[in-house]
Amino acid sequence: DCLKFGWKCNPRNDKCCSGLKCGSNHNWCKLHL
């Protein structure tokens, strides 16, 4: 399972869905441009 947009995440263990990235300073999955 991957983390969806806006979900809380850990930047050191990024489990966000493809196309998303865990923001290191706000700890939620955002669009990876």
Curated annotation (Swiss-Prot):
GO cellular component: extracellular region
Superkingdom classification of source: Eukaryota
Keywords noted in UniProt: Disulfide bond, Ion channel impairing toxin, Knottin, Neurotoxin, Secreted, Toxin, Voltage-gated sodium channel impairing toxin
Tissue expression profile of the protein: Expressed by the venom gland.
Subcellular location: Secreted
Sequence similarity: Belongs to the neurotoxin 10 (Hwtx-1) family. 22 (Htx-4) subfamily.
Protein name: Mu-theraphotoxin-Ep1a
Organism: Bumba pulcherrimaklaasi
